[in-house]
């Protein structure tokens, strides 16, 4: 490996030339130590019934060295800026004074151009002032993931950090420091930990990573400071042990039936919108054989914030879809306040984002954001008839499948460096009837797989199927195998997804300008995943469903990261195994040739044993499926 790949920086978005003018430069005195700025973006490919709000603002994290309190911005109180609707939300209210020697983090999300790129503002405290320019970053952290080497270990002891450097020169890293609270209940005041030496470079116009083994970390909030040859880079986020979980949605009604649990287990479902369900969570033998993590309110905290429960909780989620709110959107500040009790706990919060048109104003509210969007015969925030990718009129029953990727990338970038998750459309029994010429009210197997892969290829760290109720599964039995295959593949590639980061994306069109392929890549320290997702699908007029055309010749070109530019193995992978592919190196790129349709996923490694580890995990997934045989007659009997 080159010297810049062993140790690389950690940060959230931050202008590489941030010039913070303060009246207290001594690092031990009151001062503004750093700023993380995440400019708002929109997914321009999305279409809506009414014109979207064009306002682009930014989200901020201010890192303040104490002693300091009584903060104002441009002479105004934070609540005044919220009331004036210049901000979407903030967390200045009820925050304690920052004591001497400690670090306090204050966050807010702008809602007007006044707080967008090209502006500046003055931060005032009782002990210092600082002028902060709002600039687009040249270098930023795109992901921070905390992992545990032992699956049974509650606290993570490994940190994966990726930083993208779009500057024209390398970024030199000198060290890393964590700032941690003295207790989980004191999460708002952070204290410095010893600096970890990390001399390295992030190449210009490229990505680098840092893979650190550390002592077990507390499940609380932390600031990360990276010392560089310029300013320190900063981020603030919750430390949570990351695992790739697969949810079945609202499955609690039938969890007392082993036949249903066998089916869910064979589909690799390990999470659900449950908390305590009679006949399941209070049945120790059943709960042990069919472990399903809870994804719910998880109150009272004194019961659920325990070592016994932590391993059985995916995340806290109870806000529904606040951007929709049942017709009354829930203001972002209300969402922030609803999650406040959990911030002094070890439980990570999650919120459902449902409308890209406005979700930038909700960015940063939870520890583990996710979104829901379904592309066929389902309620939707976007205007399906407005998409012009079709040769004829756009259907009312479906939207471009590839917009799932657009939505995933939007949510990911607005909330980085936190990991994100996605709901993906599965069989559903609740939407019935004849809809604009389409009788089938759930995705067909191809539509189901394509939507899931567009999210996965943009690097999510959990997938939630909507909705694997017993009724829906029995009604659409042809979805079982594609769900099972996606789950098997996810188990096999899980280490690369969790330890990785999104690297590149290209939307490719034909010479005539028609949709062709979406090309996406995810890199990790030991491997790279390449996704070629077919966007040349057509409408089957006989049934009004999307169909992929027969395999066609294709050539895919992917850029390799610096540490994987001499690969030893490149194979096509799927739920059945790994097959040789026709590939060649071309400078910093790999070129793959073949005949493909639907999707093609490739694994690139420098060490051949990584391929064998992939195949071993695939075998583990098959063994799990075999351990939970499905009894169709028993399932049908449950609904008689």
Identify the residue ranges that each predicted region occupies.
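Intrinsically disordered, low-complexity Pro/Gly/Ser/Thr-rich segments with frequent PxxP/GP/PP motifs
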Residues: 77-112, 182-217, 590-599
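Glycan-processing catalytic domains of CAZymes
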Residues: 25, 29-35, 43-74, 116, ...
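Edge beta-strands of extracellular beta-sandwich domains
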Residues: 128-140, 231-239, 613-619
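Extracellular/luminal ectodomains and secreted, surface-exposed scaffolds of diverse proteins
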Residues: 33, 42-44, 78-97, 128, ...
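Glycine/proline-rich low-complexity spacer/linker segments in large multi-domain proteins
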Residues: 609-639
């Amino acid at each position: 490996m080159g010297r810049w790949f062993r140790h690389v920086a950690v940060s959230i978005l931050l202008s590489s030339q941030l010039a913070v003018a303060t009246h207290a430069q001594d690092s031990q005195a009151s001062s503004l130590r750093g700023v993380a700025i995440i400019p708002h973006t929109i997914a321009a490919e999305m279409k809506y019934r009414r014109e979207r709000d064009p306002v682009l603002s930014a989200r901020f994290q201010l890192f303040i060295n104490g002693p300091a309190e009584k903060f104002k911005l441009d002479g105004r109180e934070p609540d005044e800026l919220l009331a004036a609707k210049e901000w979407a939300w903030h967390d200045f209210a009820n925050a304690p004074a920052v004591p001497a020697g400690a670090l306090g983090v204050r966050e807010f999300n702008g809602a007007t151009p006044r707080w967008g790129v090209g502006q500046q503002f003055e931060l005032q405290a009782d002990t210092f002032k600082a002028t902060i320019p709002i600039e687009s970053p040249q270098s930023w952290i795109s992901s921070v993931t905390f992992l545990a080497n032992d699956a049974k270990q509650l606290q993570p002891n490994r940190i994966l950090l990726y930083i993208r450097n779009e500057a024209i020169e390398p970024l030199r890293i000198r060290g890393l420091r964590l700032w941690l609270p003295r207790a989980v209940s004191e999460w708002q005041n952070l204290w410095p930990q010893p600096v970890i030496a990390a001399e390295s470079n992030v190449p210009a116009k490229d990505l680098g990573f840092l893979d650190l083994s550390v002592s077990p970390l507390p499940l609380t909030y932390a600031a990360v400071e990276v010392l560089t040859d310029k300013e320190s880079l900063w981020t603030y986020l919750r430390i949570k042990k990351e695992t790739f979980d697969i949810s079945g949605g609202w499955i609690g009604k039938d969890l007392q039936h082993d036949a249903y649990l066998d089916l869910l287990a064979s589909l690799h479902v390990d999470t659900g919108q449950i908390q305590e369900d009679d006949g399941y969570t209070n049945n120790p033998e059943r709960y042990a054989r069919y472990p399903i993590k809870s994804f719910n309110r998880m109150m009272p905290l004194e019961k659920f914030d325990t070592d016994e429960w932590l391993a059985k909780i995916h995340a806290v989620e109870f806000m529904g879809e606040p951007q929709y709110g049942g017709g009354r959107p829930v203001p972002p500040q209300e969402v922030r306040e609803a999650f406040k009790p959990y911030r002094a706990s070890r439980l990570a919060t999650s919120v459902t984002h449902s409308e890209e048109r406005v979700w930038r104003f909700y960015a940063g509210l939870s520890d583990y954001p996710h979104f829901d969007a379904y592309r066929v015969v389902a309620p939707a925030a976007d205007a399906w008839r407005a998409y012009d990718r079709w040769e004829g009129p756009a259907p009312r029953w479906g939207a471009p499948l590839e917009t799932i990727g657009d939505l995933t990338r939007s949510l990911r970038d607005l909330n980085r460096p936190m990991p994100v998750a996605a709901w993906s459309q599965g069989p559903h029994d609740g939407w019935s009837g004849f809809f604009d010429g389409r009788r089938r009210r759930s995705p067909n197997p191809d539509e189901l797989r394509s939507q899931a892969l567009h999210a996965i290829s943009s690097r999510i760290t959990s997938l939630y199927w909507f909705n694997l109720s017993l009724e829906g599964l029995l009604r659409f039995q042809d979805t079982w195998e594609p769900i099972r295959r996606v789950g098997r593949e996810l188990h096999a590639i899980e280490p690369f997804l969790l330890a990785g980061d999104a690297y590149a994306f290209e939307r490719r069109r034909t010479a005539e300008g028609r949709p062709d392929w979406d090309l996406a890549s995810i890199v990790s320290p030991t491997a790279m995943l390449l996704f070629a997702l077919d966007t040349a699908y057509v409408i089957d007029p006989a049934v009004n469903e999307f169909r992929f055309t027969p395999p066609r010749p294709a050539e895919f070109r992917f850029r390799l990261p610096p540490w994987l530019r001499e690969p030893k193995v490149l194979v096509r992978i799927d739920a059945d195994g790994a097959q040789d592919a026709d590939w060649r190196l071309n400078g910093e790129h790999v070129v793959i040739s073949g005949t493909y349709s639907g999707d093609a996923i490739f694994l690139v490694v420098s060490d051949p044993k990584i391929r064998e580890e992939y195949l071993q995990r695939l075998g583990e997934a098959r063994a799990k499926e075999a351990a939970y045989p499905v009894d169709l007659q028993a399932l049908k009997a449950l609904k008689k």
